[in-house]
Structures are given as C-alpha cells and as structure tokens.
C-alpha cells in the first residue's frame, strides 16, 4: 500500500503518554502508541519523534510558582528524556530499532543530538526519538519539533493530541464549534489558534513544513495520516472549515 510521505516527524505531548491518569506514564498507552509506530515503520516510512514532558513536569507552571524559569525548563527537559526512554523501551520490545538522541549530553543514557547521525539512523529504518527539547530554556517542545523537522528534512509534522483537529472555538465549551479541515499558517497566527506556539508556526511557515493535527486516542490514526486519509486539520494549505 502506498504512503503519502517518506519521512515524518511525530510530535507527542507528555500528556498523551499518561492516558487517563492525572500524572506520569501509562504503560498500556505507551504500548499502543509503540504498536502504531511499528505498523507505520513496516510500510517503509521513516519516523522521528519529539516528546514533551508535561506529564511529569511543566517548566512554565513551576516558573509561575516562583522557580527560576531557566532551571524549571531544564528540569522539564529531563522529563522529556524519561518519556523518550520509556517509548524506546516499548518500541524495542516489539522489535523496532530505536535511538534516543538528546540535546543535553547524557552519554550513559542516549546519543548526543547529531543531525547527520539522526538522518543516517532514519535511512536505516530506525526510529529516532529526540529528548531534552532543543537544549535551551525558554523554548517549547513544539518549537523543537519544528526545528528538528526542518533539520532532518521531514515532509510533515504530525501533531498527535487528544482532540480530532483544530476548532474555531473550544468544543468543550461551545458544542457548535466548527472543526477546520485545513488552515493557513497566517490564519493560525492571526487567530492565535494555539496549534503550536507562534515560534514553531513561524519556523514551519518559513520552511514549508505542513502540520497535521489529529486525535492520537483513535486507534490507527498515525497510519491513516501516513496513508493520506482525511483526518484532523492540516495547517499549511488553504483555510477550509468542515
């Protein structure tokens, strides 16, 4: 079966890994995500992943409570490495070769982030998981996803969330909210639709990297996205509401 993409970057929030738990990592959820990734790898598509850390620690929240912002962000980076290693373990248990690369040196645990090495791993069919964000405080993991996607020449960013796309209003508050099928980068920025932070959107716009926002909790959606099926909201095209 043909796929729409050769190389994709999957952005997973930390919250996606905790399932219905209020904190931490749900092993069953991680196992399901790993299985979906394995199915996509089997089609020949190359996958890189950026993971967040909000299920363990949120730097912005800690900073608002009085912690030094840079320190809080560094702790958040460590949380992303915990998530990356957990996902790596689940993938390797089902036979998917995986490498974790971190933007902060943790040589006993993971490779350092080296762009050429990451690309070589992808070409060999390995999943590459990027941990520790960009290695710099004050930048989100969404911005890291946009940055890494540009660096490795990914054709698209899959932003896997708990909602089935981008809406013109919060669907939990406004039941008549409309879901966008597609959006321009400019509309996202002008309407502050919070698909990703503005730095990430600007990076994607500058490098012509589309962003597909879809519901991770629907089994098979990662594969559907790779196959080009109509799911979620595509940022980078025209503005079209459903």
Swiss-Prot record:
Matches recorded under InterPro entries: AceGlu_kinase-like_sf, Asp/Glu/Uridylate_kinase, Uridylate_kinase, Uridylate_kinase_bac
Enzyme class per UniProt: transferase
Alphabetized UniProt keyword annotations: Allosteric enzyme, ATP-binding, Cytoplasm, Kinase, Nucleotide-binding, Pyrimidine biosynthesis, Transferase
Entry's Gene Ontology molecular function annotations: ATP binding; UMP kinase activity
Subcellular location: Cytoplasm
Enzyme Commission code(s) on record: 2.7.4.22
Residues reported in the UniProt entry to bind ATP: 11-14, 54, 58, 161, 167, 170
Annotated binding of UMP, by residue: 53, 73, 134-141
Biological process terms in GO annotation: 'de novo' CTP biosynthetic process; UDP biosynthetic process
Family: Belongs to the UMP kinase family.
Subunit note: Homohexamer.
Protein name in the entry: Uridylate kinase
Protein's organism: Nostoc sp. (strain PCC 7120 / SAG 25.82 / UTEX 2576)
């Amino acid at each position: 079966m043909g796929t729409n993409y050769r190389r994709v970057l999957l952005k997973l929030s930390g919250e996606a890994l905790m399932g219905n738990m209020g904190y931490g990592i749900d092993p069953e959820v991680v196992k399901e995500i790993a299985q979906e990734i394995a199915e996509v790898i089997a089609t020949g598509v190359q996958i890189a992943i950026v993971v967040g850390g909000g299920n363990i620690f949120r730097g912005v929240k800690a900073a608002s409570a009085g912690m030094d912002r840079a320190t809080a962000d560094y702790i958040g980076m460590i949380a992303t490495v915990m998530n990356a290693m957990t996902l790596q373990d689940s993938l390797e248990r089902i036979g998917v070769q995986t490498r974790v690369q971190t933007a902060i040196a943790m040589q006993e645990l993971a490779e350092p982030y080296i762009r050429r090495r990451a690309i070589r791993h992808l070409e060999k069919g390995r999943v590459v998981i990027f941990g520790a964000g960009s290695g710099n405080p004050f930048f989100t993991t969404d911005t890291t996803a946009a940055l890494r996607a540009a660096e490795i020449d990914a054709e698209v960013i899959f932003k896997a969330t708990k909602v089935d796309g981008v809406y013109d209003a919060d669907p939990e508050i406004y039941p008549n909210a409309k879901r966008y099928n597609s959006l321009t980068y400019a509309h996202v920025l002008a309407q502050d639709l919070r698909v990703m932070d503005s730095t990430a959107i600007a990076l994607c716009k500058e490098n012509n990297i589309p962003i597909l926002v879809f519901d991770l909790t629907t089994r098979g959606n990662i594969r559907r996205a790779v196959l080009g099926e109509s799911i979620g909201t595509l940022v980078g095209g025209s503005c079209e509401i459903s």
